[in-house]
Regions:
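Catalytic cores of nucleotide-sugar-dependent glycosyltransferases that transfer UDP/GDP/TDP-activated
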Residues: 1-354
Length: 355
């Protein structure tokens, strides 16, 4: 197949501003190339990824959906990057069999009927916007099988979707993550530093248990970051910045557990499978797609949402988790090969539907 991937417009690939969908796009791209498909990626200027074919487009970045209210009207900045990216798609679509949209934004769905080449939409978050909900539902009805999600829990946040709905999960290059059987007395927290990620609860755990917390990720909300540090002045933590996969796994693999504290319905949680690949159990609120990744009591613990006491209690049970079981779980379900099979089947099905 000749595939055109269109990235998120909230930041350059490799910057971390796109969150988990950046890693998903990267891994899917690597796997479809390995499978012999022709691929071009359309992405914001400044995107940097090793040896992947990227057409860089200039323009002003789109505001991330998480920062907006549900009722906020659809808007774009002047010289909008999102519109510029899709104008490029319009110019070159005839050269491709399928366009794959990774942007969680209204415009690509709206433009779908005006393009001659079929468009697959990989929806990377749960419901956040009334206007976006409406057009996703309309697209699922009008263009059968073109909407894909990470998990059923994520898809369930959208009303009245039309079948078939594709649940594609995620996957990683397991060779990049080294197993560690003997961790240090430390915990990890990994993700965008933004209110919906609930980092303050992980700091509360560190403060209560006196176990050092290693924090990694892009600071997306500086005022929030400053406030939670002030709220927990004595919590033992170290902020390490936004790290490459190689650097990140070197830290995570030496931790007793990864703590995940989402305030919202996580569509998936790529950092969870990255931790499991290192043999690191995951302690998480039982919310969204994370409940489909973590096997409670075997590869980590699922805790009542927003219960810091539950997180603290779970840290006491980490010795009963076999870290090899965590690694085995990642290898069985979340390999690049399995990811490639799921996406390739989806792409073929769409082309069959459209024909």
């Amino acid at each position: 197949m000749r595939l055109l991937f269109v990235s998120t417009p909230v930041g350059p690939l490799g910057s971390g501003f796109g969150g988990g969908v950046e890693l998903s796009l990267y891994n899917i791209a690597k796997e479809v190339i390995r499978r012999g498909h022709d691929l071009q990626i359309v992405a914001p200027a400044g995107s940097r990824w090793d040896n992947l074919p990227i057409m860089q487009i200039s323009g002003n970045l789109q505001i991330i959906a998480q920062s907006l209210e549900r009722e906020t009207p659809i808007t774009m900045p002047s010289n909008p990057l999102l519109a510029n990216m899709w104008d490029y798609v319009r110019q070159v679509e005839s050269e491709y069999d399928l366009v794959v949209n990774f942007a969680y934004d209204w415009l690509p769905f709206y433009l779908t009927p005006f393009l001659k080449t079929p468009v697959a939409h990989f929806v990377s978050m749960g419901s956040l916007s009334d206007a976006l909900d409406q057009i996703i539902v309309q697209t699922s009805k009008r263009f059968s099988g073109t909407i894909g999600f990470y998990t059923p829990a994520q898809a369930a946040t959208f009303p009245e979707l039309t079948s078939p709905i594709y649940y594609l999960s995620s996957g990683i290059d397991l060779s990049l993550y080294q197993f560690c059987s003997q961790p240090k007395e430390q915990l990890a927290w990994l993700g965008r530093i933004s209110p919906e990620k609930g980092l303050e609860d992980a700091l509360a755990v560190a403060n209560s248990t006196n176990i050092s917390l290693k924090i990694m990720g892009k600071i997306q909300d500086e005022s929030y970051w400053q406030k939670i540090q002030q709220d927990y002045p004595n919590a033992p933590f170290e902020y390490l910045g936004f790290l490459s996969t190689k650097e990140m796994q070197q830290v995570v693999r030496e931790c007793r557990a990864l703590i995940m504290t989402p305030r919202w319905v996580e569509a998936f949680g790529n950092v969870a499978i990255e931790a499991l690949a290192c043999g690191v159990p995951v302690i998480s609120y039982s919310r969204g797609g994370l409940a489909s990744i973590i096997k409670d009591g075997k590869t980590g613990f699922l805790v009542e949402p927003d219960s810091v006491a539950g997180l603290i209690e779970a840290t006491k049970g980490l010795n009963q988790i076999n870290r090899q079981t965590c690694r085995d779980s990642a290898e069985k379900v979340f390999s690049l090969e399995a990811l490639g099979e799921r996406f390739e089947k989806w792409f073929v099905d769409i082309l069959n539907f459209q024909s």
